[in-house]
């Protein structure tokens, strides 16, 4: 199911790329001793947006700085530690290369597993931007990418 969400986000991000930014898919997180990947990265100017794709069952998901819940039940669906770590490691990786990139707050792009029933989101205090995936076309900037940043991130692509 998760791969389906990643594919849908990838297709959506291609429309974003047609407006100027560069989009990369399936990057490894550098400077860690175990395999961690980033589903998508968007480079717009010197800004880098890391995006994790999710495919969730319909319902209301909410959090106020603690555990994410679906309705009243806790759910482990929001892996914020990995996204925070990925942001920090990508920023350090680019800094070591002397690149003036600004790695933004990670985005979690959520799709409903049932197109006829929505996922509703009220998630705050997690240090992540949790959004319906369709909103990516509105919230991501449209500037052409800094090619040096894209080139450095391309070295992290999984084969």
Residue ranges, per PLM feature:
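Short glycine-enriched loops at secondary-structure junctions
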Residues: 53-57
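Phosphate-centric recognition/catalysis
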Residues: 39
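Gly/Thr-rich phosphate-binding beta-strand-loop-beta motif of the actin/hexokinase/Hsp70
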Residues: 50
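Surface-exposed interaction regions that form or flank ligand-binding interfaces
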Residues: 1-36, 45-47, 59-64, 70-159
């Amino acid at each position: 199911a998760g791969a389906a969400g990643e594919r849908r986000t990838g297709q959506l991000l291609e429309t974003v790329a047609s407006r100027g930014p560069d989009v990369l898919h399936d990057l490894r997180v550098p400077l860690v001793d175990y395999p961690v990947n980033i589903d998508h990265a968007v480079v717009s100017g010197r800004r880098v947006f890391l995006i994790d794709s999710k495919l969730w069952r319909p319902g209301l998901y909410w959090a106020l700085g603690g555990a994410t819940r679906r309705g009243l039940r806790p759910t482990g669906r929001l892996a914020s530690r990995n996204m925070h770590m990925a942001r920090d490691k990508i920023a350090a990786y680019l800094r070591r290369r002397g690149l003036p990139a600004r790695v933004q707050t990670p985005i979690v792009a959520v799709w409903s597993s049932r197109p006829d029933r929505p996922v509703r989101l009220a998630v705050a205090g997690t240090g992540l931007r949790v959004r319906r995936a369709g909103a990516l076309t509105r919230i991501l900037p449209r500037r052409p990418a800094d090619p040096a940043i894209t080139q450095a991130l391309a070295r992290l692509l999984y084969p």
